[in-house]
Amino acid sequence: MLPLLLPLQLLLLMVMKGGHGCQGPELDRELVLAKVRALVLDALGPPNASKDGGKPVAQRLTRRHAHTGGSTRRSMENEDEDLSQVILFPTTGPGCEDEPEARAAEGLFTYTFRPSLHTRSRQVTAAQLWFHTGLDKVGAEVHNDSGPMVTLLAMSSGGPMAVPILLGPAPPHWAVLHLAAPAFTLLTRPLLVLLLRCPNCPCPAQLDATPFLVAHTRARPPSVGERARRSPLPPPWPWSPAALRLLQRPSEDPAAHADCHRAALNISFQELGWDQWIVHPPSFIFHYCHGGCGLVPSPVLSPGAALTPSQPLPLGPGSRPCCAAMPSTMRPLRVRTTSDGGYSFKYEIVPNLLTQHCACI
């Protein structure tokens, strides 16, 4: 029996430290907010102050896009669109020391890219290949008597195929190759092999001269069948402010919350004072464990039997059970933050924040 008590006591200490439980019969909203603040700050750290005096994100983004001719309403709608920018570095490149002289004179460089599963699952809206040419001006020497100076090929099952590109403005010693829309599907491959031909370009041996791909993506719109599956069923009751208040505060009946249960609280980041830092989601449902356990007898388990979330864990003699989250059932909260007022965003995760199952532990 003694070898079994030690891991159970350690489990109890872990739950009392990290779980959301062991609260009194009445739980104040400010106490829950303070707990959420501590968990978020412990995971993300304190927010960075905006360099422009903390101007509202919506106003700054609207002003930034005003010169494009779009309406303010359209700019506000674009803020909620799931956009991302990915930079891909090659996993393998040409070995400049071992490069054959014939290929080096031809200026043919081979690079292998491995787009992530996240990138392949999204819709590419723009893509550029940045390549270090070592030349001051590439745009003036794009065409010569023998044809284009920089060409791009992609390996396929049928052999190399030409990739349509457009040479755009670039800093000195670099070339920016904008891929045409038909070439966006290349980034949906798990393995992408590009062959770049630049006869007058030296082999980029230095690390800061490594080429890279820049992909702008957005969430792929769901198909008709997916939209039908994802469409939530209408609630059996009409939504009203009274229903929202039920989520924001516990029931007035103490008996309904006397036993151990999973409670819910609607928390907005504006209420926490972080709406200029955490911009998405604007609010979330915080689940936590609440209620008493009473005098719950320890269950007698047969060898190999598993506990269910509704069963109390066996404790040592004299131990008092606590209503807390079941270990390994906490879920993270994914948020999008900004530290410069909306000019750039960062996707972050607050781990072990949302309770899934409660039990008397």
From Swiss-Prot:
Cellular compartments annotated: Secreted
GO molecular function annotation: cytokine activity; growth factor activity; hormone activity
Protein name: Inhibin alpha chain
Residues making up the signal peptide according to the UniProt record: 1-21
Protein family (similarity comment): Belongs to the TGF-beta family.
Residues the record marks as site: Cleavage: R64, H65, R230, S231
Gene giving rise to this polypeptide: INHA
Function: Inhibins and activins inhibit and activate, respectively, the secretion of follitropin by the pituitary gland. Inhibins/activins are involved in regulating a number of diverse functions such as hypothalamic and pituitary hormone secretion, gonadal hormone secretion, germ cell development and maturation, erythroid differentiation, insulin secretion, nerve cell survival, embryonic axial development or bone growth, depending on their subunit composition. Inhibins appear to oppose the functions of activins.
Annotated keywords: Cleavage on pair of basic residues, Disulfide bond, Glycoprotein, Growth factor, Hormone, Secreted, Signal
Organism: Trichosurus vulpecula (Brush-tailed possum)
Sequence segments annotated as region (Disordered): 45-82
Glycosylation positions in this chain: N48, N144, N266
